[in-house]
From Swiss-Prot:
This is Protocadherin gamma-A12. Residues 30-692 are extracellular. It comes from Homo sapiens (Human). Its main location: membrane. Residues 922-932 have a biased composition (Basic residues). Keywords: Calcium, Cell adhesion, Cell membrane, Glycoprotein, Membrane, Repeat, Signal, Transmembrane, Transmembrane helix. Potential calcium-dependent cell-adhesion protein. May be involved in the establishment and maintenance of specific neuronal connections in the brain. Gene3D superfamilies: Cadherins. Pfam families: Cadherin (PF00028), Cadherin_2 (PF08266), Cadherin_C_2 (PF16492), Cadherin_tail (PF15974). It is found in: Cell membrane. It is a single-pass type I membrane protein. Residues 816-841 have a biased composition (Polar residues). GO terms for cellular component: cell-cell junction; plasma membrane. Residues 803-841, 902-932 are annotated as: Disordered.
């Protein structure tokens, strides 16, 4: 039992503490001061900073201010001293007319805490007003037969002060006929009355002059006076009388002007003139005198001003009725003004935030509203609400204050601003309402990154584009605003084929337009993968990226390239072999071409552009195969020239041509045997070119022969000295020229021959045109005297088997040397023996030529007739290892067949693909031609 009892006691103490804390907090928010009226402006009322628990400097820092009420501000805050001071002269009588306690209320707002403190200031009365009479002079008529002790009302004095400073007493100037008596009303008012003490005699004195003095209880005492003149009349023995001592009326405040409220009525028993009664206000305040009017004849009270319950809800007046004899009666008139719902509620914004961040938490204060209705009772009861489905709510605060706060977290991207309508409605009939509109902007925060409308972008650009051309425009959207929506575009770093991406494309950081910095080549690369980044300027900045695929479109900017037959570098033309026994459709060769473009631009077609024998050959449109169109006849020329065109399908189409020379023969030796009688087709342009070449070479030869003759003439003087040398060379008669050529000389001669000896392709007869001789040293071989040297060429050839007219060798001329640039070899670059001499007669020249052709025939037939081993150019075994075909260029590139475009091909290189026996040539696949 004891623990349970202690628990109940403890619980009661806790509840009592909570209740006391609540009462203390409520009391702390109400501050009271007292101040006398009529203080000068700036007079101290109270230390508001101390009562708020603040330092004076904190008043401004924390936003402490007085919430204004009405147009006139009576008080102000002194930020230096922290005091509440008067803002002007305070007149208690003007503010609180007739009120016993004059109390002024004001509200002080502490903005940082959004807390309101109520302040009550009691204005104490001082004796600043003297009593006064509205009429400074008054005339009273009294019948001479008036009875003593008859009372006559005197004018009432006014004193706006209260308490002891208000009206306290009346005094009448001394006289023998009258005295003064003061009546106290129910409300504490004092009404002076004149009492007749001694009977009047008009004949003795027709008028009496009195002075009525009103005094207050202030210190010092203030007084007011009124002069009274008493006129003595003839006898009238009856006074008027009101039907009732008090008249009451309740009227609504919205009455129209001139409306009759009530009628007072008084009667006089006298007759005639003495019975006539006139009505007047005996007592009425200033406000009532401006609102009500009393008809002096009828006693009707009507309105001459607008009634306002909020200004004054009750009026009290005193009327009197007086006959001609001066007798009077009085009655009270009480008028109650009923309230009607004629005032709509008033809404005052005491604090307002123009904008609120969109990420503000729920319950953020937007505005502080003060709601008031001047009506009373239900007409003054107000309810507030927000129109529409808005994310805000009103919370009841201190007194008539409401707080407008957010109900959810706002999002500027959904709703950037709100027009809030706060409606205040009273409970009157009919109810009146007031709408207050609040415009609220939602401040943006950077909570949205830029967004691209597409997940990825693709752009196409033809190759060979000009630099600086725009490729594509990418645009991102940021739902934010201002700086948070300003987007900067950039490209992610990347490397393409070893080069930075920035060397190929760039992007405008403001517009997002992508530009080409270089001209693209489809054959180099066909697409670019670019990552575009969009970043806003918020804090912190947000970004997003998108992939951009840039495809390069092919253009027909590459002509077909012919891979086979390849164009020789030495100016010769390849020869394809077609046996005379070939049937129609026989595959002679195949033109192979490629195009570096793609698609339709790389589709190739082949056609026979020109042929020396039309109808003999055909070219496959898509394969490029050159086949015989019919059987070969004996009348068909040995050499057939074909021009094959290869064309792509681009726009515009590009093409390339190749010239093929087809030898109609069964073998290479047959081709060489028939070269002497080969006739080329007439071609005016080629014939002219050949003529020019013949004339040029003939001129050079003539100059050379003249030079040789000059040298021979100079050597006649030394003829006798050379007899011994000639005698020693007599045993060489009948020896072939090939036995006099040394290894080094042949090598140098062949190299020079390969570059400087040319055979015209279309001459009417076969000619060998030799440039200026450039011979190497010659060696004598005794071992080869016994052998004969057959020659391959016949007919009109300049070579002959019987060329033995001059077999003696002139002595070497050691003074005639050639510079390094004049020596045999390609452009004089071959190394030779600086001590050798050159043949200086026609015999040696012809023998060397015969040796070259014999060696060529030997290599073509795969056998040697000069006694040398394989690949030794027919030289003896003594010189074979030192000079082989591996040390010199392929003769098939250097020896031309006169009168044709063909070069010598290895006789062993048949279509069967077998290599010649004992040869060192390369092996070719079956069905392929060896092209040099």
């Amino acid at each position: 039992m004891i623990p349970a009892r202690l628990h109940r006691d403890y619980k009661g103490l806790v509840l009592l503490g909570i209740l006391l804390g609540t009462l203390w907090e409520t009391g702390c928010t109400q501050i009271r001061y007292s101040v006398p009226e009529e203080l000068e402006k700036g007079s101290r009322v109270g230390d508001i900073s101390r009562d708020l628990g603040l330092e004076p400097r904190e008043l401004a820092e924390r936003g402490v201010r007085i919430i204004p009420r009405g147009r006139t501000q009576l008080f102000a805050l002194n930020p230096r001293s922290g005091s509440l001071v008067t803002a002007g002269r305070i007149d208690r009588e003007e503010l609180c007319m007739g009120a016993i306690k004059c109390q002024l209320n004001l509200d002080i707002l502490m903005e940082d805490k959004v807390k309101i403190y109520g302040v009550e200031v009691e204005v104490r009365d001082i004796n600043d007003n003297a009593p006064y009479f509205r009429e400074s002079e008054l005339e009273i008529k009294i019948s001479e037969n008036a009875a003593t002790e008859m009372r006559f009302p005197l004018p009432h004095a006014w004193d706006p002060d209260i308490g002891k400073n208000s009206l306290q007493s009346y005094e009448l100037s001394p006289n023998t006929h009258f005295s003064l008596i003061v009546q106290n009303g129910a409300d504490g008012s004092k009404y002076p009355e004149l009492v007749l003490k001694r009977a009047l005699d008009r004949e003795e004195k027709a008028a009496h002059h009195l002075v009525l003095t009103a005094s207050d209880g202030g210190d010092p005492v203030r007084t007011g006076t009124a002069r009274i003149r008493v006129m003595v009349l003839d006898a009238n023995d009856n006074a008027p009388a009101f039907a009732q001592p008090e008249y009451r009326a309740s009227v609504p405040e919205n009455l129209a002007l001139g409306t009759q409220l009530l009628v007072v009525n008084a009667t006089d028993p006298d007759e005639g003139v003495n019975a006539e009664v006139r009505y007047s206000f005996r007592y009425v305040d200033d406000k009532a005198a401006q609102v009500f009017k009393l008809d002096c004849n009828s006693g009707t009270i009507s309105t001459i001003g607008e009634l306002d319950h909020e200004e004054s809800g009750f009026y009290q007046m005193e009327v009197q009725a007086m006959d001609n004899a001066g007798y009077s009666a009085r009655a009270k008139v009480l008028i109650t003004v009923l309230d009607v719902n004629d005032n709509a509620p008033e809404v005052v914004l005491t604090s307002l935030a123009s904008s609120v961040p969109e990420n503000s938490p729920r319950g953020t204060l937007i505005a502080l509203l003060n709601v008031n209705d001047q009506d009373s009772e239900e007409n003054g009861q107000v309810i507030c609400f927000i129109q529409g489905n808005l994310p805000f709510k009103l919370e009841k605060s201190y007194g008539n204050y409401y707080s407008l706060v957010t109900d959810i977290v706002l999002d500027r991207e959904q709703v950037p601003s709100y027009n809030i309508t706060v409606t205040a409605t009273d409970r009157g009939t009919p109810p009146l309402s007031t709408e207050t509109h609040i415009s609220l902007n939602v401040a943006d925060t950077n909570d949205n990154p830029p967004v691209f409308p597409q997940a990825s972008y693709s752009a196409y650009i033809p190759e060979n584009n000009p630099r600086g051309v725009s490729l594509v425009s990418v645009t991102a959207h940021d739902p934010d605003c201002e700086e948070n929506a300003q987007i900067t575009y950039s490209l992610a770093e990347n490397t393409i084929q070893g080069a930075s991406l920035s060397s190929y494309v760039s992007i405008n950081s403001d517009t997002g337009v992508l530009y080409a910095l270089s001209s693209f080549d489809y054959e180099q690369f066909r697409d670019l993968q670019v990552k575009v980044m969009a970043r806003d300027n918020g804090h912190p900045p947000l970004s997003s990226n998108v992939s951009l695929s840039l495809f390069v479109l092919d253009q027909n900017d590459n002509a077909p390239e012919i891979l086979y037959p390849a164009l020789p570098t030495d100016g010769s033309t390849g020869v394809e072999l077609a046996p005379r026994s070939a049937e129609p459709g026989y595959l002679v060769t195949k033109v192979v071409a490629v195009d570096r473009d793609s698609g339709q631009n790389a589709w190739l077609s082949y056609r026979l552009l020109k042929a020396s024998e039309p109808g003999l050959f055909s070219v496959g449109l898509h394969t490029g195969e050159v086949r015989t169109a019919r059987a070969l006849l004996d009348r068909d020329a040995l050499k057939q020239s074909l021009v094959v065109a290869v064309q792509d399908h681009g726009q515009p189409p590009l093409s390339a041509t190749v010239t093929l020379t087809v030898a109609v023969a069964d073998s290479i030796p047959q081709v060489l045997a028939d070269l002497g009688s080969l006739e080329s087709p007439a071609n005016s342009e080629t014939s002219d070119l050949t003529l020019y070449l013949v004339v040029a070479v003939a001129a050079v030869s003539c100059v050379f022969l003249a030079f040789v003759i000059l040298l021979l003439a100079l050597r006649l003087r030394r003829w006798h000295k050379s007899r011994l040398l000639q005698a020693s060379g007599g045993g060489l008669t009948g020896a072939p020229a090939s036995h006099f050529v040394g290894v080094d000389g042949v090598q140098a001669f062949l190299q020079t021959y390969s570059h400087e000896v040319s055979l015209t392709t279309d001459s009417r007869k076969s000619h060998l045109i030799f440039p200026q001789p450039n011979y190497a040293d010659m060696l004598v071989s005794q071992e080869s005297f016994e052998k004969s040297e057959p020659l391959l060429l016949s007919g009109d050839s300049v070579f002959s088997k019987d060329s033995h007219g001059l077999i003696e060798q002139a002595p070497p001329n050691t003074d005639w040397r050639f510079s390094q640039a004049q020596r045999p070899g390609t452009s004089g670059s071959q190394n030779g023996d600086d001590t050798g001499t050159w043949p200086n007669n026609q015999f040696d020249t012809e023998m060397l030529q015969a040796m070259i052709l014999a060696s060529a025939s030997e290599a073509a037939d795969g056998s040697s007739t000069l006694g040398g081993g394989a690949g030794t150019m027919g030289l003896s075994a003594r010189y074979g290892p030192q000079f082989t075909l591996q040390h010199v260029p392929d003769y098939r590139q250097n020896v031309y067949i006169p009168g044709s475009n063909a070069t010598l091909t290895n006789a062993a290189g048949k279509r069967d693909g077998k290599a010649p026996a004992g040869g060192n040539g390369n092996k070719k696949k079956s069905g392929k031609k060896e092209k040099k």
